[in-house]
Amino acid sequence: MINTNDFKTGQTIKFNNQIYQIIEFLHVKPGKGTAFVRSKLRNLRTGSVIDHTFNAGIKLEPALINKIKMQFLYSSQEKYIFMNTQTYEQLEINKDQLKEKLHYLYEGLLVEIIFYNNNEILTISLPDKISLKVTYAEPGVKGDTKTNSFKDATLETGLVIKVPLFINTGEKIIVNTETGLYLSRDNNK
């Protein structure tokens, strides 16, 4: 059992028949009354984030999850195919389970697939940042150097994000997979 006083960021718990990952928490001990723990929890099945306040000292059941490194191979209609990098077994995941993470998947990308009880697929964990090729961007106008000027760019996965004016079609850029924001040019090309 996990005591709320011993919460750690990244831990997984069972709460209200759901599997949650602790995103952040704060122990509060008011002058009067009992101590409590404010927490922000991500539902690993749905991806939604909730705020919940637990009384201090309450015990919760840990959720035992497995993370397996897999490589994205290809998509076929509504299915996305991943391969275990150790055993070479292939795994199909439905499009609706991947939600907003679809926009970052490209052939060969290494991800972690998170399983509950070794059989239920909860979600996939993407790298924090990935390199994607710009397939279309309006050309930048020479002399248009206003600070913080952005334009839309379409990436190889179909994702459209805001990029600085100096980014052109064909360049590789680094994108934050949590926020979907442009980080920098990819100088490794």
UniProtKB/Swiss-Prot annotation:
Example of a GO MF term: translation elongation factor activity
Protein name stated in the entry: Elongation factor P
Keyword tags: Cytoplasm, Elongation factor, Protein biosynthesis
Keyword field contains Cytoplasm: yes
Main localisation: cytoplasm
PANTHER family for the chain: ELONGATION FACTOR P, ELONGATION FACTOR P (EF-P) FAMILY PROTEIN
Role of this protein: Involved in peptide bond synthesis. Stimulates efficient translation and peptide-bond synthesis on native or reconstituted 70S ribosomes in vitro. Probably functions indirectly by altering the affinity of the ribosome for aminoacyl-tRNA, thus increasing their reactivity as acceptors for peptidyl transferase.
Species of origin: Phytoplasma australiense
A Gene Ontology biological process term: peptide biosynthetic process
Similarity comment: Belongs to the elongation factor P family.
Gene Ontology CC terms, in alphabetical order: cytoplasm
Pathways involved: Protein biosynthesis; polypeptide chain elongation
Subcellular location: Cytoplasm
